[in-house]
């Protein structure tokens, strides 16, 4: 039954709808993830935060992400990709919205500690978005398209940070940092979109023995009548393995380490960048947000560029080119750390 996906010549409108929904999910949830960098930049002077307090606020989501990835991956295998996706979107949106009620620096629970606690939950929820939406999309897509589609789904991650920068630049003087946290509730819209637009993964349904539901899900993806799809006469065999067996594959371990290194660099720039601009260069929080917009625009352009190269060059060479260019630019950036080009800092 699933082999019908592999015979596709081009993606259907429903498959594109799924890809767009996943992109929107990444954009909105990474808005919530990176918003804290701009809020911390504003609070650094307002609350006279120490380096330790500011650092803990920015680090907190990273504490919640690793266990979150394991948890949501496990949950997605047990209750379904779609349901886990919805729950992760709810988690990150509510955790961000609750920070509207952050007490002041002298409250019973100091404001910085309140932010640390709920940022852990933001990281926990965000790990689910990244862990679940890729398998969900891939299981609706033919194998020969998965590399390209996976790259496309993550293309708008920096756009979430860019939107956070735009919102902070324009709205911070009007609604304050608490108002920015309320905007973080917007990902709840995703819950309704996913609930009504996206069915459960046909591969997961087949693995659970729910063949009729799997047929309807596959028919939705292919945009055909479910009656045109024949049910398999036998259930697919599922081999149970322990997660630790993944470490038997050296290439998988190497890919995981490289992913961790690249994610660390990207996360550091997005979250720590605005605060460092305020602390080191003395910019205003609003101007720091404005400058970060250009960083994130270049990140979006770069992701589209690499995505376009995947089919002609292949996945390995595209990834190699990306890593080499990133390494060269990091060296150049470090060498010219005190040189500014483009926009003048006169308007700080």
Task: For every predicted segment, state its role.
Residues 1-31:
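Cytosolic juxtamembrane N-terminal segment immediately preceding the first transmembrane helix
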Residues 36-37, 249-300:
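Extracytoplasmic gate region of multi-pass secondary transporters
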Residues 145-173, 187-188:
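Glycine-rich segments within core transmembrane alpha-helices of 12-TM secondary carriers
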Residues 70-80, 303-314:
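Helix-to-loop junctions at the C-terminal end of transmembrane segments
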Residues 346-348:
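Conserved small/polar residues in nucleotide/adenosyl-binding loops
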Residues 1-8, 195-251:
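Intracellular cytosolic loops and amphipathic helices of Major Facilitator Superfamily
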Residues 90-108, 325-337:
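C-terminal ends and interior cores of transmembrane alpha-helices
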């Amino acid at each position: 039954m699933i082999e019908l996906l592999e015979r596709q010549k081009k993606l259907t409108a429903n498959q594109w709808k799924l890809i767009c929904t996943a992109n929107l999910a990444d954009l909105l949830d990474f808005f919530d993830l990176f918003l804290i960098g701009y809020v911390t930049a504003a609070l650094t002077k307002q609350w006279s935060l120490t380096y330790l307090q500011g650092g803990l606020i920015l680090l907190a989501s990273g504490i919640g992400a690793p266990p979150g990835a394991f948890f949501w991956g496990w949950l997605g295998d047990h209750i379904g990709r779609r349901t886990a996706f919805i729950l992760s979107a709810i988690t990150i949106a509510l955790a961000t919205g609750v920070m509207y009620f952050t007490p002041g620096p002298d409250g019973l629970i100091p404001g910085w500690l309140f932010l640390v606690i709920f940022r852990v939950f933001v990281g926990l929820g965000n790990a689910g978005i990244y862990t679940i939406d890729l398998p969900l999309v891939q299981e609706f897509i033919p194998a020969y398209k998965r590399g390209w589609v996976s790259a496309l789904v993550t293309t708008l991650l920096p756009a979430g940070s860019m939107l956070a920068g735009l919102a902070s630049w324009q709205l911070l003087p009007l609604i304050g940092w608490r108002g920015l946290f309320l905007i973080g509730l917007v990902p709840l819209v995703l819950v309704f979109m996913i609930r009504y637009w996206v069915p459960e993964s046909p591969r997961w349904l087949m693995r659970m023995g729910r063949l009729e539901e799997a047929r309807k899900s596959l028919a939705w993806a292919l945009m055909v009548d479910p009656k045109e799809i024949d049910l398999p006469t036998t259930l697919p065999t599922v081999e149970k393995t322990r997660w630790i067996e993944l470490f038997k594959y050296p290439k998988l371990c190497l890919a995981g380490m490289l992913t961790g290194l690249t994610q660390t660099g990207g996360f550091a720039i997005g979250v720590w960048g605005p605060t460092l601009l305020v602390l080191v260069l003395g910019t205003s929080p609003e101007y720091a947000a404005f400058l970060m917009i250009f960083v994130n625009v270049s990140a979006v352009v770069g992701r589209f560029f690499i995505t376009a190269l995947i089919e002609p060059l292949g996945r390995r060479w595209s990834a190699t080119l990306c890593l080499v260019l990133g390494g060269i630019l990091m060296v150049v950036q470090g060498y010219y750390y005190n040189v500014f080009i483009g926009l003048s800092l006169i308007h700080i």
